[in-house]
Amino acid sequence: MSKNVFKFFGSLALFAFVLSGTVVKAGTKEDVAKKGSVSCGVSQGVPGFSNADASGKWSGIDVDMCRAVAAAVLGDANKVKYQPLSAKDRFEVLKSGQIDMLSRNTTWTLSRDAGLGLEFVGTNFYDGQGFIVRKAAKVNTAKKLNNVKVCVETGTTTELNLRDYFKANKLKYEAVSFTKADEAVAAYDAGRCDVYTTDKSGLAAQRTKMKNPGEHTVLPETISKEPLGPVVRGNDQNWKDIAAWSLYVMIEAEELGVSSKNIDSMKSTDNPNIKRLLGLEGDTGKSLGLSNTWAYNIIKQVGNYGEVYEKNVGAKTPLGLARNGSPNQLWSKGGILYAPPVR
Protein backbone atom coordinates (compact mmCIF):
# COMPACT_ATOMS: atom_id res chain seq x y z
CA MET A 1 0.00 0.00 0.00
CA SER A 2 1.44 3.38 -0.98
CA LYS A 3 2.37 6.12 1.49
CA ASN A 4 -0.29 8.35 -0.06
CA VAL A 5 -2.97 5.79 0.82
CA PHE A 6 -1.71 5.63 4.41
CA LYS A 7 -1.83 9.43 4.59
CA PHE A 8 -5.34 9.46 3.15
CA PHE A 9 -6.74 6.99 5.68
CA GLY A 10 -4.83 8.65 8.51
CA SER A 11 -6.30 12.03 7.61
CA LEU A 12 -9.76 10.49 7.23
CA ALA A 13 -9.55 8.93 10.70
CA LEU A 14 -8.44 12.22 12.24
CA PHE A 15 -11.25 14.08 10.46
CA ALA A 16 -13.84 11.60 11.74
CA PHE A 17 -12.40 11.85 15.26
CA VAL A 18 -12.71 15.63 15.24
CA LEU A 19 -16.24 15.50 13.84
CA SER A 20 -17.29 13.07 16.55
CA GLY A 21 -16.71 15.76 19.14
CA THR A 22 -14.51 13.46 21.23
CA VAL A 23 -11.37 15.57 21.12
CA VAL A 24 -9.65 15.07 24.46
CA LYS A 25 -9.82 18.13 26.67
CA ALA A 26 -9.74 18.93 30.34
CA GLY A 27 -12.96 18.22 32.20
CA THR A 28 -14.73 20.31 34.81
CA LYS A 29 -12.88 18.61 37.66
CA GLU A 30 -9.55 19.56 36.13
CA ASP A 31 -10.73 23.14 35.57
CA VAL A 32 -11.88 23.37 39.18
CA ALA A 33 -8.57 22.00 40.45
CA LYS A 34 -6.65 24.51 38.33
CA LYS A 35 -8.58 27.58 39.49
CA GLY A 36 -8.90 26.31 43.07
CA SER A 37 -12.62 26.84 43.54
CA VAL A 38 -16.07 25.62 42.48
CA SER A 39 -18.23 28.21 40.69
CA CYS A 40 -21.76 27.56 41.86
CA GLY A 41 -24.97 29.17 40.61
CA VAL A 42 -27.42 29.88 43.42
CA SER A 43 -30.64 31.83 43.96
CA GLN A 44 -30.85 35.55 44.48
CA GLY A 45 -31.91 34.93 48.06
CA VAL A 46 -34.11 32.12 49.40
CA PRO A 47 -33.59 31.61 53.16
CA GLY A 48 -32.79 28.02 54.04
CA PHE A 49 -31.72 27.18 50.49
CA SER A 50 -29.28 29.82 49.26
CA ASN A 51 -29.11 33.15 51.01
CA ALA A 52 -26.35 35.61 51.89
CA ASP A 53 -26.24 37.37 55.26
CA ALA A 54 -25.23 41.00 55.83
CA SER A 55 -21.54 40.06 55.70
CA GLY A 56 -21.96 38.23 52.40
CA LYS A 57 -21.68 34.72 53.85
CA TRP A 58 -23.87 32.21 52.02
CA SER A 59 -25.84 29.43 53.69
CA GLY A 60 -28.60 26.96 52.87
CA ILE A 61 -29.28 23.43 51.68
CA ASP A 62 -28.28 24.30 48.11
CA VAL A 63 -25.18 26.13 49.33
CA ASP A 64 -24.15 23.04 51.30
CA MET A 65 -24.45 21.02 48.10
CA CYS A 66 -21.88 23.33 46.50
CA ARG A 67 -19.71 23.03 49.59
CA ALA A 68 -19.91 19.24 49.50
CA VAL A 69 -18.57 19.15 45.94
CA ALA A 70 -15.76 21.54 46.87
CA ALA A 71 -14.86 19.34 49.85
CA ALA A 72 -14.80 16.25 47.62
CA VAL A 73 -12.68 17.75 44.85
CA LEU A 74 -10.53 20.34 46.61
CA GLY A 75 -10.55 19.08 50.19
CA ASP A 76 -11.99 22.39 51.40
CA ALA A 77 -15.73 23.09 51.54
CA ASN A 78 -15.11 26.83 51.69
CA LYS A 79 -13.53 26.99 48.24
CA VAL A 80 -16.74 28.01 46.48
CA LYS A 81 -17.56 31.14 44.50
CA TYR A 82 -21.29 31.83 44.46
CA GLN A 83 -23.09 33.45 41.55
CA PRO A 84 -26.68 34.58 42.24
CA LEU A 85 -28.90 33.85 39.23
CA SER A 86 -32.48 34.51 38.22
CA ALA A 87 -34.70 31.58 37.29
CA LYS A 88 -34.78 32.90 33.74
CA ASP A 89 -30.99 33.02 33.27
CA ARG A 90 -29.80 30.02 35.29
CA PHE A 91 -29.70 27.38 32.56
CA GLU A 92 -28.00 29.53 29.93
CA VAL A 93 -25.33 30.59 32.40
CA LEU A 94 -24.63 26.93 33.20
CA LYS A 95 -24.60 25.90 29.54
CA SER A 96 -22.19 28.72 28.66
CA GLY A 97 -19.62 27.45 31.16
CA GLN A 98 -19.73 30.51 33.42
CA ILE A 99 -20.43 28.24 36.39
CA ASP A 100 -19.43 24.66 37.18
CA MET A 101 -22.76 23.62 38.67
CA LEU A 102 -26.20 24.99 39.44
CA SER A 103 -27.61 24.45 42.92
CA ARG A 104 -30.61 26.74 42.94
CA ASN A 105 -33.88 25.12 44.13
CA THR A 106 -34.39 23.84 40.57
CA THR A 107 -37.13 21.38 39.64
CA TRP A 108 -36.15 18.22 37.75
CA THR A 109 -38.46 17.81 34.73
CA LEU A 110 -38.34 15.79 31.52
CA SER A 111 -37.99 18.81 29.23
CA ARG A 112 -35.16 20.28 31.26
CA ASP A 113 -33.34 16.99 31.65
CA ALA A 114 -33.67 15.84 28.05
CA GLY A 115 -33.93 19.09 26.13
CA LEU A 116 -31.26 21.44 27.45
CA GLY A 117 -28.07 19.42 27.23
CA LEU A 118 -27.93 19.39 31.03
CA GLU A 119 -27.99 16.67 33.68
CA PHE A 120 -29.84 16.64 36.99
CA VAL A 121 -27.65 14.73 39.42
CA GLY A 122 -30.23 13.89 42.08
CA THR A 123 -32.82 15.37 44.43
CA ASN A 124 -31.67 17.15 47.57
CA PHE A 125 -35.16 18.37 48.53
CA TYR A 126 -38.60 17.02 47.64
CA ASP A 127 -41.13 19.83 47.47
CA GLY A 128 -44.47 20.84 46.00
CA GLN A 129 -46.07 24.10 44.92
CA GLY A 130 -48.53 25.93 47.12
CA PHE A 131 -50.15 29.30 47.75
CA ILE A 132 -49.86 31.93 50.46
CA VAL A 133 -52.64 34.44 51.18
CA ARG A 134 -53.52 37.01 53.80
CA LYS A 135 -55.39 35.65 56.78
CA ALA A 136 -57.73 38.63 56.52
CA ALA A 137 -59.01 37.25 53.21
CA LYS A 138 -60.49 34.31 55.16
CA VAL A 139 -59.65 31.84 52.40
CA ASN A 140 -58.93 28.32 53.65
CA THR A 141 -58.59 26.42 50.38
CA ALA A 142 -57.08 27.04 46.97
CA LYS A 143 -60.39 25.98 45.42
CA LYS A 144 -61.77 29.39 46.44
CA LEU A 145 -59.07 31.37 44.64
CA ASN A 146 -61.24 32.76 41.85
CA ASN A 147 -60.75 36.10 40.10
CA VAL A 148 -57.50 36.75 41.96
CA LYS A 149 -54.18 38.36 41.10
CA VAL A 150 -51.26 35.99 41.63
CA CYS A 151 -47.64 37.14 41.99
CA VAL A 152 -45.25 34.67 40.36
CA GLU A 153 -41.63 34.44 39.20
CA THR A 154 -41.01 33.98 35.47
CA GLY A 155 -38.92 31.19 33.97
CA THR A 156 -40.15 28.62 36.50
CA THR A 157 -42.31 25.51 36.61
CA THR A 158 -44.38 27.57 39.05
CA GLU A 159 -45.85 29.55 36.15
CA LEU A 160 -46.83 26.39 34.31
CA ASN A 161 -48.32 24.68 37.37
CA LEU A 162 -50.30 27.82 38.19
CA ARG A 163 -51.86 27.84 34.74
CA ASP A 164 -52.66 24.12 34.85
CA TYR A 165 -54.21 24.26 38.32
CA PHE A 166 -56.53 27.17 37.59
CA LYS A 167 -57.55 25.69 34.24
CA ALA A 168 -58.27 22.26 35.73
CA ASN A 169 -60.38 23.78 38.49
CA LYS A 170 -62.16 26.27 36.21
CA LEU A 171 -60.88 29.26 38.17
CA LYS A 172 -59.92 32.65 36.78
CA TYR A 173 -56.76 34.53 37.70
CA GLU A 174 -54.39 37.23 36.52
CA ALA A 175 -50.67 36.48 36.71
CA VAL A 176 -48.46 39.36 37.83
CA SER A 177 -45.00 38.22 36.73
CA PHE A 178 -41.54 39.19 37.95
CA THR A 179 -38.01 38.14 36.98
CA LYS A 180 -36.86 37.99 40.60
CA ALA A 181 -38.52 36.13 43.46
CA ASP A 182 -37.87 39.02 45.86
CA GLU A 183 -39.76 41.36 43.54
CA ALA A 184 -42.75 39.01 43.44
CA VAL A 185 -42.76 38.68 47.23
CA ALA A 186 -42.45 42.44 47.73
CA ALA A 187 -45.33 43.07 45.33
CA TYR A 188 -47.55 40.58 47.16
CA ASP A 189 -46.57 42.04 50.53
CA ALA A 190 -47.41 45.52 49.25
CA GLY A 191 -50.90 44.39 48.26
CA ARG A 192 -50.46 44.29 44.49
CA CYS A 193 -51.53 40.64 44.47
CA ASP A 194 -54.03 38.55 46.40
CA VAL A 195 -51.82 35.47 46.28
CA TYR A 196 -48.16 34.54 46.01
CA THR A 197 -47.20 31.12 44.71
CA THR A 198 -44.00 29.07 44.68
CA ASP A 199 -42.73 25.81 46.19
CA LYS A 200 -43.99 25.36 49.76
CA SER A 201 -40.48 25.52 51.18
CA GLY A 202 -40.10 28.82 49.32
CA LEU A 203 -43.36 30.10 50.80
CA ALA A 204 -42.03 29.37 54.28
CA ALA A 205 -38.74 31.07 53.42
CA GLN A 206 -40.25 34.15 51.78
CA ARG A 207 -42.80 34.63 54.55
CA THR A 208 -39.90 35.38 56.90
CA LYS A 209 -39.10 38.44 54.75
CA MET A 210 -42.60 39.93 54.90
CA LYS A 211 -43.41 42.94 57.09
CA ASN A 212 -45.84 40.97 59.25
CA PRO A 213 -45.28 37.23 58.66
CA GLY A 214 -48.03 36.27 61.08
CA GLU A 215 -50.66 37.93 58.89
CA HIS A 216 -50.18 35.36 56.11
CA THR A 217 -51.08 31.69 55.85
CA VAL A 218 -50.06 28.89 53.49
CA LEU A 219 -53.08 27.08 52.05
CA PRO A 220 -53.20 23.28 52.55
CA GLU A 221 -53.15 22.23 48.88
CA THR A 222 -49.94 20.99 47.27
CA ILE A 223 -50.57 21.26 43.54
CA SER A 224 -47.43 19.71 42.06
CA LYS A 225 -44.38 17.52 42.55
CA GLU A 226 -41.17 19.55 42.74
CA PRO A 227 -38.05 17.38 43.06
CA LEU A 228 -35.35 19.99 43.57
CA GLY A 229 -31.70 19.31 42.91
CA PRO A 230 -28.36 20.36 41.48
CA VAL A 231 -27.65 20.47 37.75
CA VAL A 232 -24.47 20.15 35.67
CA ARG A 233 -23.64 20.22 31.98
CA GLY A 234 -24.42 17.03 30.10
CA ASN A 235 -21.03 16.60 28.44
CA ASP A 236 -18.98 15.61 31.50
CA GLN A 237 -19.90 12.26 33.01
CA ASN A 238 -17.13 12.38 35.61
CA TRP A 239 -18.31 15.73 36.96
CA LYS A 240 -21.90 14.49 37.09
CA ASP A 241 -20.76 11.43 39.04
CA ILE A 242 -18.83 13.58 41.51
CA ALA A 243 -21.82 15.85 42.13
CA ALA A 244 -24.25 12.93 42.43
CA TRP A 245 -22.11 10.93 44.82
CA SER A 246 -21.41 14.01 46.93
CA LEU A 247 -25.16 14.07 47.59
CA TYR A 248 -25.42 10.31 48.07
CA VAL A 249 -22.58 10.31 50.59
CA MET A 250 -24.45 12.73 52.86
CA ILE A 251 -27.55 10.52 52.74
CA GLU A 252 -25.54 7.32 53.28
CA ALA A 253 -23.66 8.87 56.19
CA GLU A 254 -26.90 9.69 57.99
CA GLU A 255 -28.22 6.18 57.46
CA LEU A 256 -25.01 4.72 58.90
CA GLY A 257 -25.09 7.10 61.86
CA VAL A 258 -21.98 9.01 60.81
CA SER A 259 -22.02 12.76 61.41
CA SER A 260 -19.59 15.67 61.35
CA LYS A 261 -19.37 15.39 65.14
CA ASN A 262 -18.62 11.67 65.51
CA ILE A 263 -16.82 10.89 62.26
CA ASP A 264 -13.35 10.70 63.76
CA SER A 265 -14.43 8.31 66.51
CA MET A 266 -16.03 6.16 63.80
CA LYS A 267 -12.60 5.38 62.36
CA SER A 268 -12.23 2.56 64.89
CA THR A 269 -15.43 0.82 63.76
CA ASP A 270 -15.55 -2.74 62.48
CA ASN A 271 -18.48 -1.92 60.16
CA PRO A 272 -17.15 -2.42 56.60
CA ASN A 273 -19.73 -0.01 55.15
CA ILE A 274 -18.48 2.80 57.38
CA LYS A 275 -14.85 1.89 56.69
CA ARG A 276 -15.46 2.20 52.94
CA LEU A 277 -17.32 5.48 53.44
CA LEU A 278 -14.41 6.97 55.37
CA GLY A 279 -11.83 5.71 52.90
CA LEU A 280 -10.28 3.26 55.35
CA GLU A 281 -10.99 0.30 53.08
CA GLY A 282 -11.32 -0.02 49.32
CA ASP A 283 -10.65 2.72 46.81
CA THR A 284 -13.99 4.49 46.26
CA GLY A 285 -12.26 7.69 45.23
CA LYS A 286 -10.34 6.08 42.38
CA SER A 287 -13.23 5.75 39.91
CA LEU A 288 -14.14 9.41 40.51
CA GLY A 289 -10.57 10.60 40.12
CA LEU A 290 -10.55 11.78 43.75
CA SER A 291 -8.52 11.02 46.85
CA ASN A 292 -9.85 8.28 49.10
CA THR A 293 -10.73 10.87 51.75
CA TRP A 294 -13.26 12.62 49.49
CA ALA A 295 -16.30 11.31 51.38
CA TYR A 296 -14.67 11.89 54.77
CA ASN A 297 -14.05 15.52 53.79
CA ILE A 298 -17.71 16.02 52.85
CA ILE A 299 -19.07 14.57 56.09
CA LYS A 300 -16.50 16.24 58.33
CA GLN A 301 -16.81 19.70 56.78
CA VAL A 302 -20.44 19.82 55.62
CA GLY A 303 -22.26 17.10 57.58
CA ASN A 304 -24.66 14.30 56.77
CA TYR A 305 -28.01 15.02 55.13
CA GLY A 306 -29.87 15.22 58.44
CA GLU A 307 -27.43 17.78 59.80
CA VAL A 308 -27.72 19.88 56.65
CA TYR A 309 -31.52 19.72 56.72
CA GLU A 310 -31.97 20.61 60.39
CA LYS A 311 -29.42 23.42 60.29
CA ASN A 312 -30.99 25.15 57.30
CA VAL A 313 -34.72 24.43 57.16
CA GLY A 314 -35.56 22.21 60.13
CA ALA A 315 -38.10 22.62 62.90
CA LYS A 316 -35.82 24.88 64.96
CA THR A 317 -35.12 27.31 62.11
CA PRO A 318 -37.30 30.27 61.04
CA LEU A 319 -38.70 28.07 58.23
CA GLY A 320 -39.78 25.41 60.74
CA LEU A 321 -40.08 22.55 58.25
CA ALA A 322 -40.58 19.38 60.28
CA ARG A 323 -38.81 16.48 58.62
CA ASN A 324 -40.73 13.57 60.10
CA GLY A 325 -43.65 12.61 57.91
CA SER A 326 -42.13 14.35 54.89
CA PRO A 327 -40.55 12.77 51.81
CA ASN A 328 -37.23 14.31 52.92
CA GLN A 329 -36.75 11.67 55.59
CA LEU A 330 -34.68 8.51 55.14
CA TRP A 331 -36.46 5.61 53.47
CA SER A 332 -35.97 3.60 56.68
CA LYS A 333 -37.93 6.24 58.63
CA GLY A 334 -40.88 6.68 56.29
CA GLY A 335 -39.39 9.08 53.75
CA ILE A 336 -38.03 8.45 50.27
CA LEU A 337 -34.36 9.44 50.65
CA TYR A 338 -32.24 6.56 49.45
CA ALA A 339 -28.60 6.37 48.39
CA PRO A 340 -27.04 3.65 46.24
CA PRO A 341 -24.36 1.58 48.01
CA VAL A 342 -20.98 3.27 48.37
CA ARG A 343 -18.76 0.37 47.33
Residue ranges and their predicted role:
Residues L19-A26:
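Sec/Tat signal peptide C-region and signal peptidase I cleavage site
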Residues R67, A71, G75, K79-K144, ...:
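Acidic, polar ligand-binding/catalytic clefts
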Residues A26-G27, A33-S103, L288-L290, Q301, ...:
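Extracytoplasmic small-molecule ligand-binding "clamshell" domains
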Residues S39-G48, W58-V73, T107, D127-E183:
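Bilobed "Venus flytrap"/periplasmic-binding protein-like clamshell domains
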Residues D64-R67, A71-V73, A136-V139, K143, ...:
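Extended ligand-binding regions for polar small-molecule ligands
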Residues L280-R343:
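C-terminal functional modules
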Residues V80-E92, A175-A190:
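Short helix-initiation/N-cap motifs at beta->coil->alpha
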Residues M1-L12:
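Bacterial N-terminal signal peptides that target proteins for export
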